Amino acid sequence: MDAGFFRGTSAEQDNRFSNKQKKLLKQLKFAECLEKKVDMSKVNLEVIKPWITKRVTEILGFEDDVVIEFIFNQLEVKNPDSKMMQINLTGFLNGKNAREFMGELWPLLLSAQENIAGIPSAFLELKKEEIKQRQIEQEKLASMKKQDEDKDKRDKEEKESSREKRERSRSPRRRKSRSPSPRRRSSPVRRERKRSHSRSPRHRTKSRSPSPAPEKKEKTPELPEPSVKVKEPSVQEATSTSDILKVPKPEPIPEPKEPSPEKNSKKEKEKEKTRPRSRSRSKSRSRTRSRSPSHTRPRRRHRSRSRSYSPRRRPSPRRRPSPRRRTPPRRMPPPPRHRRSRSPVRRRRRSSASLSGSSSSSSSSRSRSPPKKPPKRTSSPPRKTRRLSPSASPPRRRHRPSPPATPPPKTRHSPTPQQSNRTRKSRVSVSPGRTSGKVTKHKGTEKRESPSPAPKPRKVELSESEEDKGGKMAAADSVQQRRQYRRQNQQSSSDSGSSSSSEDERPKRSHVKNGEVGRRRRHSPSRSASPSPRKRQKETSPRGRRRRSPSPPPTRRRRSPSPAPPPRRRRTPTPPPRRRTPSPPPRRRSPSPRRYSPPIQRRYSPSPPPKRRTASPPPPPKRRASPSPPPKRRVSHSPPPKQRSSPVTKRRSPSLSSKHRKGSSPSRSTREARSPQPNKRHSPSPRPRAPQTSSSPPPVRRGASSSPQRRQSPSPSTRPIRRVSRTPEPKKIKKAASPSPQSVRRVSSSRSVSGSPEPAAKKPPAPPSPVQSQSPSTNWSPAVPVKKAKSPTPSPSPPRNSDQEGGGKKKKKKKDKKHKKDKKHKKHKKHKKEKAVAAAAAAAVTPAAIAAATTTLAQEEPVAAPEPKKETESEAEDNLDDLEKHLREKALRSMRKAQVSPQS
C-alpha cells in the first residue's frame, strides 16, 4: 500500500512529469507555412545558406556562427520539423524573432523544393534583377568608358588641332618677327647705304637708297621670298661659282631686285615684327650706312656676297667685311625668311620645342632640302647666306648701326642688344668692320640668337628656346624670332652646316652660359669681327688695332656680345667662305657640309678673317686675292679665325670665351675649310673635348702657326658651333635631351669619326690656348668638365644614334667632308704653308676636331672650360684622346675608321 499510489501510473499520467515540448507546441504561435513539410533533398541548401546567414546577422545584429551552424545542421535532415526548429531557435533568437525568421525561411524552402534547380524563385528573381542591374551597370560603365574615351580623343584632337593652329599661327609670327625685321631693315638700309655710300658700281643699293629701302620694306613682303630666292640663287651661285666675276654683275641685277624684294620683305617683316625696332634700327642703320661708306660697300658685298663677295673681299678688307655683312643679310634674310616662314618656325619650334631631336631632324631636312632644291639651296645657301645674311644682316644691321654707333639698330637685336648694340655701335662704330661682323653676324645671327639675347639672355641663354622666349624679352622677341629664324636657318644649314651653325650658336650660347665670358667671347668674336672688319677695311693695321681694340672691346663684346659675335658669324657667314670655296658648292651639294663650311666659315670667317688680317695681314690679302680662288677664301675663313686668334689673344680673356668658342669654332671652320668639316661632324665628342682643347688649340692657332690652326680650328668650330647652335639648344637640351645632340652628333659623330683624331691632334694645340683661355676659362672650366663628361658620354650614344640615324648622312657627310677636307686642307695648307703647312695641317686637322669638340664643350661649358682647358689642355690631349677614343670605340668604331682617315 506504501507504493500502491504509484502503481499503474505512467510518466505521461504523472503530473510531476510533463512534456514541455508539447506544451510549447501548444503555447507557441507558428506561421501557417510551417505546417507543410519540406524535402530538403530537393532544396539547394548552398543557395539558402547565404540568406540564412544574412538574416540571422540582421536579427542578432552580429554574425553568430554557432546559431547559423545550428540552423544549417537542423536543415540537413531530409524532412526537418519546422515547429521544432522554431522552438529550438526561440532560445537564440527569442520567440518573436524566431517566428519571423521561420516564417521567412520556410516559404523559401518550399519554393526551392518546388523549383527544379532547388533554388527559391525569389532568389531567382532577385538574381535576375541583379543580373539585369549588373548588365545595366556594365552597359553604363561601358558607355561611360566609351564616352570618356571619346572625350579623351576629342580633347586630344582638339588639343592637337589647337596646337597645330597655335604652331601655324606662331610659325608665321616667328618667321615674320625673326627674319624680316632685323635682316630686312638692316640689310635694306645698309644696302641703301652701301649703294649710296661706298660702291656706286656695286651700289646695288643705288636703287636701294634709303628711300627705296623703306618703300621696299613696305612693298616686298610678297617679293622678298621669290626675289630673294631668285636673287639668292644667283647670288649664291655667284658666291659659289663666280665668287668674284659674277659678284659684280649679278649684284646690279639682284640688287635692284633684292633691294626691293629683300628690302621689302626684310623691311616689311622687320616692320611687322620690330616696327619700333625697325624704325629706330632703320634710322640708325641708315645713319650707320651713311656714316660708314665701308659699310655700304660691305652691304653690296653682302648682297653680292656670292657675286662680288670675293671681288669685294679682294678690293678691300673693309669692303669685304662690310659687304659680306650687308650683302649676305640682303640675300640671306629673304631665303631664311622662306625657310623661316616655311619651316624655320616649325624647325625652330622643333629646335626650341625639341631642339635636340627636331633640330637634328629639321637640320637634316634642311640639309637635305637645300641640296634637293636649288632654289632652296639658294634659300638654303640663302639660309647660309641668311645665316650669314639674315643672321648676318640683322647682326650686320646691328653691327652696322653699331659701327655707326647707332644703338637703335642694335635695338633690333633686342632692347638689351640695342643697349649693347649702342655700346657696341659706339664701340663697334669701330666695327664698321662688323659689317664683316655681318658675316660674323651670320654667325652673329646665330650668335645674335644667343648673343643679342645672350648679352642679357645669355645668362638666360641656357637654352636657345630660352633665348627665343626670354632672350631679350621685348626686343629680344623679335630678335629672338630672328634668331630663331637664324637658328632654324642655321639649323637648316646646321643639317648641312647646322650643327656647325647650331654649334656656333651654342658656343655663343655657351658664351651666354658663360655669361660675361660668353659675352666676351661673342664680343671678342664681334670684336674680332669688328676689329677684323676694321682690319679688313684697314686690313693689316686695322687688324692689329682691332685685335687690340678687342681687349678694350671685351666690354663691347659683353655689351654687344650678341651684336659683336654676330658680326663674327656674319663675317664667317659672309659668303666669302662659300665663294672662297667653290667647294662651298660641294657644300651645297652636301648642304650640311657646305653649309657647315660656308656658314661656319662665314661666321668664323668674319672674325677669323679679321684674325687672319690681324695675325697675318698678307695672308688675308692673299685670301682676298684668293677670294676668287675659293680655297683661299676658305683659308680666308680659317685665316679670319687666325685673325681672331690674334685678336683672340687680346680678346682672349673676353674673346677667349667667344674666341675659344669662336677660336675653336674658327679652328673648326678652318677644319671644315680644310678637311675638318667632316671632323666637325664626325667629332661631336671631339668637339666637346675640342672645345676645351680648342679653346687652347685655337689660342695656339692664334699664335703664329696656331693662328692658321685657329683659323682652321675656329672656322671648323664655327660650323660645329652652328651645330651647337642647333644643338646648343639641344645641347642645353643635350644635357636634358640628347636627340638633338644626336643630330649634332650625327654631324658630330661624323665629325668625331674624322674629327676626333683631329681633336686628339688638336689637343697639342690646346696648351697654347690655356693662357688665352685662362681668363675665359675661369668661366669655362666648370662647364667644360661637365661637357666633357656629357659630350663624351652623350656623344657615344648620340653618335651611335647618329650613326644609325645619320649613318647614311654621316657617310655622305663624311664623303663631302673628306672632299671638303681635301679642298680645305689644300686651301688652308696653302695659307698655312705660309705659316706652317705641315704643323698647321696636322695640328689644324686635330686642332680642328679639338676645336670642334672644344666648341661643343665651350658652348655649354664655356664657364667650366678655362681651368679644365688649362689643366685639360695637357690632360685634354690625353683625356680628349682617351675620351674620344673611348667614345668613338664605344659609340663610333665605324667613326674610328672615319677618324683614321680624317686624321691621316
From Swiss-Prot:
- Keyword Membrane (UniProt): no
Protein name per the record: Serine/arginine repetitive matrix protein 1
- Region listing for Necessary for mRNA 3'-end cleavage and cytoplasmic accumulation, in residue ranges: 1-156
Indicate the family of this protein.
Belongs to the splicing factor SR family.
Q: Where is this cross-link: Glycyl lysine isopeptide (Lys-Gly) (interchain with G-Cter in SUMO2)?
A: K127, K231, K249, K447, K459, K472, K869
Q: Which SUPFAM superfamilies match?
A: PWI domain (SSF101233)
| One of the Pfam families matching this protein, by short name | PWI
| Subcellular location, principal | nucleus
Reported effect of changing K22A?
Strongly reduces DNA and RNA-binding
Gene Ontology molecular function terms on file: DNA binding; RNA binding
**UniProt crosslink position (Glycyl lysine isopeptide (Lys-Gly) (interchain with G-Cter in SUMO1)):** K231
The outcome of changing K20A is: Strongly reduces DNA and RNA-binding
Write down the species: Homo sapiens (Human)
What segment(s) does the record annotate as region Necessary for DNA and RNA-binding? 1-151
Tell me the residues on which Phosphothreonine occurs: T220, T241, T406, T416, T555, T572, T574, T581, T614, T718, T778, T793, T872
Q: Describe how it is modified after translation.
A: Phosphorylated on multiple serine and threonine residues by DYRK3 during the G2-to-M transition, after the nuclear-envelope breakdown. Phosphorylation by DYRK3 promotes disassembly of nuclear speckles.
Ubl conjugation as a keyword of this entry, yes or no, is: yes
